[in-house]
Regions:
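Acidic/His- and Gly-rich active-site-bordering loop/insert found
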Residues: 2-107, 111-131
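Metal-dependent amide/peptide-bond hydrolase catalytic core
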Residues: 2-5, 218-408
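Divalent metal-coordination and catalytic microenvironments
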Residues: 34, 81, 110, 135, ...
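Short, small-residue-enriched loops and turns at beta-alpha junctions
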Residues: 37-42, 88, 142-143, 249-251, ...
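Buried hydrophobic packing segments
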Residues: 51, 116-124, 148, 217-220, ...
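Histidine/acidic-residue-rich, glycine-tolerant segments that coordinate divalent metal ions
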Residues: 67-68, 88-90, 95-105, 111-112, ...
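Non-cysteine beta-strand/loop elements that form the S-adenosyl-L-methionine
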Residues: 80-82, 193, 351-354
């Protein structure tokens, strides 16, 4: 059973919520404006300027080249609230009159997150906060090197004692209106790999005097799936996705080389290191057994995204006090988010906010039966306007949980 927040926290929560309600109409308009004018990773300055100009009385500090942060509240310890600035290289197909018209789209909900953080800052400016609140408008979440890596590496937050870093992400796989917190790992570590097999070219009619890299690649592809199913504990989520395979120039030519690339996703650190080593062994043995040579390059990506136990325990009662249901079974996935890097400087909390499609978005009859399956990074993904308020209130609860953490 969730315990009620103490009197002072409950009172501050109520006051913040009142001010938040007043800020929401402008936040909804801002969300549409941001959505209509998306910027790709590394080119987010117009979006950042739009948000910065909507906070005219707050001093902005540039971070990670195209992002910025603002601070309100007392000096000293502060809770950081993160929202992402970048969009995706997609052509939007939502059909709404405020859709983007170019080759970029907010198909991951970042427009919702930005508007929600703006609304929270507007509300928080009007009350006496117990600890500082840093609004971090972060660029380059969708690419590597990521914005979070730049923020952490630059020590831009070192001037303040960071109590916690809080984020929220819309998630269509969570029931609409429900928020999932969940202690421990909630997103996977993700590492990219590229494998090249060097064989010996030849005529397709004479494979015995060539070294064909294609069947070697095929054996590696199936062998990788066996590494997951036969060397990893079955209750440990792990995924190896091979997203690209390249070899050859013509049907009757055995190519000199072939290449494949993909991503390793793991929810346990020991599985991460095991699969790195096992893939290298598998590839080199498969190549050597057939007279070929191999190159294996594994690029370490985002670490596990881990929710701090204390932050979850403090946030859940606040969400409940706001009338927001907390997921009984926490949402976890093998997706990855650069938010995980903030654990290097402070405890972290990522909340997954359940959303549904905006009913105003037209949808074709062919898609009607699969509408509930429209997910992140889809050209028709468009959370309803209610998502802005739900994300903002979730971030508000996360901020107050961080403030309580400072007292413990």
């Amino acid at each position: 059973m969730l315990t009620s927040p103490d009197g002072d926290t409950a009172e501050l929560l109520a006051v913040l919520n009142q001010h938040l309600e007043l800020a929401l109409p402008h936040a909804l308009a801002l969300r549409r404006e941001v959505h209509r004018h998306p910027d790709l990773s590394g080119a987010e300055r117009p979006t950042a300027d739009r948000l910065r100009h909507a906070l005219p009385t707050l001093k902005a500090t540039r971070v990670a080249d195209t992002g910025f942060l603002v601070r309100i509240g007392p000096p000293g310890p502060a809770v950081v609230i993160r929202a992402e600035l970048d969009a995706l290289p997609l052509v939007e197909a939502t059909g709404v009159d405020w859709a983007a018209t170019g080759t970029a789209m907010h198909a991951c909900g970042h427009d919702v997150h930005l508007a929600a953080l703006w609304a929270l800052l507007q509300a928080a400016r009007k009350v006496d906060l117990p600890v500082g609140l840093i609004g971090l408008f972060q660029p380059r979440e969708e690419v590597q090197p990521s914005g979070a890596q730049s923020v952490v590496g630059s020590a831009v937050l070192a001037e303040d004692e960071v109590i916690a870093v809080v984020g929220a992400h819309v998630q269509p796989r969570v029931v609409s209106g429900v928020v999932s917190t969940g202690m421990g790992a909630v997103n996977a570590a993700a590492d990219e790999f590229e494998i090249t097999i060097h064989g010996h070219p030849g005529h397709g009619a004479y494979p015995h005097i060539a070294v064909d890299p294609v069947p070697i690649l095929a054996s590696i592809i199936t062998g990788m799936q066996e590494l997951v199913s036969r060397t990893i504990d079955p209750v440990h989520p792990s995924v190896i996705t091979i997203g690209r395979v390249e070899a050859g120039t013509a049907a009757n030519i055995i190519p000199a080389s072939g290449r494949l690339s993909g991503v390793i996703r793991t929810m346990y650190e020991q599985d991460r290191s095991h699969l790195h080593n096992a893939i290298r062994t598998l590839v080199h043995h498969a190549a050597a057994a057939r007279g070929a040579t191999a190159e294996v390059e594994i690029t370490t990506g985002h670490p596990l995204l881990v929710n701090d136990r204390r932050l979850v325990q403090l946030t859940d009662p606040l969400l409940d006090h706001l009338g927001i249901p907390v997921a009984h079974e926490p949402f976890r996935s093998c997706g990855a988010d650069d938010f995980s890097h903030y654990a290097e400087i402070a405890p972290t909390l990522m909340m997954f906010v359940g959303v549904q499609q905006d009913p105003a978005a037209p949808i074709s009859p062919a898609e009607l039966n699969s509408r509930s399956q429209v997910g992140l990074h889809h050209p028709t993904f468009l959370p309803s306007s209610d998502a802005v308020a739900l994300v903002a209130r979730s971030l508000m609860a996360g901020y107050l949980a961080g403030a309580q953490l400072a007292r413990h």
